[in-house]
Every structure is written in structure tokens, then in C-alpha cells.
């Protein structure tokens, strides 16, 4: 299924016979794999033995994003098992702030190992590598990232890791310790934010999406804004910790204390 998804992930028409030949599978096997992808929520159209994966929104432009986020390296994938897993596996080749960005992940997960639903090109899904002084509280780090996202998106935060819009979950944050090396805690921070979900999407809790704020929202613009705000807040946190200004902004953006 993952090989078929990779073939379809450029969202260009694919001829049935070409897919069978490239993947070395039979007609029945192709039909079974297509059915599994559709069951996973992917919108795959079929006409005259031609298949097309239809994205929820236009695919991201990794070159434009890399330019905007320089000097950090952006590792873009149309599909991957997990962005957190990618950062963890590549940690020895990354520098602080490098990130992995994906249109669709097949094994995404949230807090406590919960599966993270991931429509194709309907969210912002990314993870980045960060390193901090072990004397800094990890709880504080999660608060800082949550506030930065809420500031960038004009939304609310709910401790410990939820981003809310109109009282419904818009996104989440997952912070994991990779190792304690060279006097630093090396971390991977994973973030998922709903931008536009298909009407048929089934989620077990009330959810929100950024198209509620702006039906014409641009994912690239929002992604860059969110990441830049996160890195700015993290730099401030490393210098000043949780100070009075931060606490006031946290209260202002807290779902239960803000306006």
C-alpha cells in the first residue's frame, strides 16, 4: 500500500496498467490496495482505468519554504511513516532547527501513542530537532510552543498540548526526548494542525480547521509564520525562561482564562 501511495502522491494521473507494471502486482492486488487507501480516507478518483489522488489543498512548495526558513534545512516528503521518526533516525545529520515536512504520514501518533489522523495535503504536519539545557523544564518547552502557535494562528491553547479554535481541537504537539548528549537534551517536536479536512473525515472528538477562519487560507504562508514564531519564542525561552510577559500572553491565549 505504501508503494502505491508513493506512486500516486504527486497527484498526477496514473494509468492502471502502468501502476501494475511498476509495482509488479496483479489487477486484483491493485484493486485491494486502492480499496485500503480509500478506507484510510484518501480521495482517489478513477475514470477509464486512470487513477488520480486528489489533495485537500495544493501541494506545498518545498523550495519556497526552504528559502523562507533559511538557514534551517527542510526535508520535504509527500508521504512518510512519521515525521518524528524521520527526525529521530536522522538526528546525527541534523542541526538544531532542521525540520521534516510531509503531506501525509501513515504512522503518525499523538500523545500517549494515539493515532494522528492525517488527510492528504489537508494539514500542516512537521517535526523539528531542538536541543535545550537540561535544567530547563520540558513542561515549559511545550507551553512555549503552544503559545507560539496560538499567537501565529490567533487561536487558543489548552494544557498540555492542544491548540483550540472555537473550543474544538485544531492541532496538537508531541515533544519527545531523543537522548541526553553533550550536556544537552536533544528533542524532536512534532506538530499537526488541521487546515482543511474532507467532509467525510471521521474523528472521535469535535475538531476545527483553519479554513473556518479563512476559506482561502494558504498553507505555505501559515506554515512559515508558525515555524518562525515557534523559533522566536524558543529563543526567548532559552534566554529568559518563563517570564512575566510570557505568562500574560499565555493567560490571554488560554482557552479557560483568555477573553
Residue spans of the language-model regions?
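N-terminal lobe of the biotin/lipoate ligase/transferase fold
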Residues: 2-146
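Catalytic beta-strand/loop module used to bind and position nucleotide/cofactor moieties
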Residues: 3-6, 10-11, 17, 21, ...
Amino acid at each position: 500500500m505504501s508503494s502505491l501511495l508513493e506512486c500516486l502522491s504527486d497527484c498526477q494521473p496514473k494509468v492502471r496498467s502502468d501502476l501494475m507494471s511498476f509495482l509488479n502486482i496483479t489487477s486484483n492486488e491493485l484493486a485491494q490496495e486502492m480499496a485500503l487507501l480509500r478506507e484510510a480516507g484518501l480521495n482517489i478518483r478513477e475514470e477509464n482505468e486512470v487513477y488520480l489522488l486528489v489533495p485537500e489543498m495544493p501541494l506545498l512548495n518545498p523550495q519556497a519554504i526552504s528559502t523562507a526558513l533559511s538557514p534551517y534545512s527542510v526535508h520535504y516528503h509527500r508521504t512518510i511513516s512519521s515525521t518524528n521518526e524521520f527526525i529521530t533516525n536522522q538526528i546525527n545529520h541534523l542541526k538544531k532547527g532542521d525540520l521534516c515536512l510531509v503531506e501525509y504520514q501513515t504512522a503518525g501518533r499523538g500523545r500517549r501513542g494515539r493515532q494522528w489522523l492525517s488527510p492528504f495535503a489537508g494539514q500542516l504536519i512537521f517535526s523539528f530537532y531542538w536541543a535545550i539545557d537540561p535544567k530547563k523544564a520540558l513542561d515549559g518547552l511545550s507551553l512555549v510552543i503552544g503559545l507560539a502557535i496560538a499567537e501565529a494562528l490567533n487561536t487558543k491553547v489548552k494544557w498540555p498540548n492542544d491548540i483550540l479554535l472555537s473550543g474544538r481541537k485544531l492541532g496538537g504537539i508531541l515533544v519527545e526526548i531523543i537522548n541526553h548528549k553533550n550536556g544537552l537534551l536533544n528533542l524532536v517536536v512534532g506538530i499537526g494542525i488541521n487546515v482543511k479536512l474532507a467532509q467525510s473525515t471521521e474523528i472521535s472528538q469535535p475538531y476545527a480547521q483553519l479554513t473556518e477562519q479563512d476559506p482561502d487560507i494558504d498553507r505555505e504562508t501559515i506554515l512559515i509564520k508558525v515555524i518562525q514564531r515557534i523559533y522566536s519564542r524558543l529563543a526567548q525561552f532559552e534566554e529568559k525562561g518563563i517570564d512575566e510577559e510570557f505568562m500574560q500572553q499565555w493567560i490571554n491565549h488560554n482557552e479557560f482564562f483568555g477573553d
